[in-house]
Amino acid sequence: MSILQIVAIVAIIVALILAIVVWTIVYIEYKRLLRQRKIDWLIDRIRERAEDSGNESEGDTEELSTLVEMEPDNFRNDNDM
């Protein structure tokens, strides 16, 4: 094998590894975005129910607290994007 073939094979392997890393990061960010949307939706729903009935819905509050406990990040901080 010539040196050019070896360099080409190494370049393909490096490109494959980089592609896997990039798509993994994209997937993690996508999941985080979906979780944030669900949390925002639950917060809006709790606010609407609180306005309608004068108190918060216990089921929604429990679901929101469960979601927040799953991820230790501060979801309301949008400055890091």
Swiss-Prot record:
Ranges where the record places region Disordered: 50-81
Q: What is known of its domains?
A: The N-terminus and transmembrane domains are required for self-oligomerization and proper virion budding, whereas the cytoplasmic domain is required for CD4 degradation. The cytoplasmic domain is composed of 2 amphipathic alpha helix that form a U-shape.
What extra comment accompanies this record? Answer: HIV-1 lineages are divided in three main groups, M (for Major), O (for Outlier), and N (for New, or Non-M, Non-O). The vast majority of strains found worldwide belong to the group M. Group O seems to be endemic to and largely confined to Cameroon and neighboring countries in West Central Africa, where these viruses represent a small minority of HIV-1 strains. The group N is represented by a limited number of isolates from Cameroonian persons. The group M is further subdivided in 9 clades or subtypes (A to D, F to H, J and K).
Query: Which Gene3D superfamilies does the UniProt entry name for this protein?
Result: HIV-1 VPU cytoplasmic domain
| Oligomer and partners | Homopentamer. Interacts with host CD4 and BRTC; these interactions induce proteasomal degradation of CD4. Interacts with host BST2; this interaction leads to the degradation of host BST2. Interacts with host FBXW11. Interacts with host AP1M1; this interaction plays a role in the mistrafficking and subsequent degradation of host BST2. Interacts with host RANBP2; this interaction allows Vpu to down-regulate host BLM sumoylation.
* GO terms, biological process: receptor catabolic process; symbiont-mediated suppression of host innate immune response; symbiont-mediated suppression of host type I interferon-mediated signaling pathway; symbiont-mediated-mediated suppression of host tetherin activity; viral release from host cell
Q: How is it modified after translation?
A: Phosphorylated by host CK2. This phosphorylation is necessary for interaction with human BTRC and degradation of CD4.
Task: List the Gene Ontology MF annotations in alphabetical order.
Answer: CD4 receptor binding; monoatomic cation channel activity
Could you tell me where the Acidic residues compositional bias lies?
A: 53-63
Q: Which residues carry this modification: Phosphoserine?
A: S53, S57
User: Which regions face the Extracellular side of the membrane?
Assistant: 1-7
Q: Member of which family?
A: Belongs to the HIV-1 VPU protein family.
Describe the task this protein carries out: Enhances virion budding by targeting host CD4 and Tetherin/BST2 to proteasome degradation. Degradation of CD4 prevents any unwanted premature interactions between viral Env and its host receptor CD4 in the endoplasmic reticulum. Degradation of antiretroviral protein Tetherin/BST2 is important for virion budding, as BST2 tethers new viral particles to the host cell membrane. Mechanistically, Vpu bridges either CD4 or BST2 to BTRC, a substrate recognition subunit of the Skp1/Cullin/F-box protein E3 ubiquitin ligase, induces their ubiquitination and subsequent proteasomal degradation.
Localization in the cell: Host membrane
Q: What is this protein called?
A: Protein Vpu
Q: Where are the transmembrane segments?
A: 8-28
Principal location listed in the UniProt entry: host cell
| Superkingdom | Viruses
What switches its activity on or off, per the activity regulation note? Ion channel activity is inhibited by hexamethylene amiloride in vitro.
> Got a GO cellular component term for this one?
host cell membrane
Q: Which UniProt keywords apply?
A: AIDS, Apoptosis, Host membrane, Host-virus interaction, Inhibition of host innate immune response by virus, Inhibition of host tetherin by virus, Ion channel, Ion transport, Membrane, Phosphoprotein, Transmembrane, Transmembrane helix, Transport, Viral immunoevasion
Pfam families documented for this protein? Vpu
Q: Membrane topology for this entry?
A: Single-pass type I membrane protein
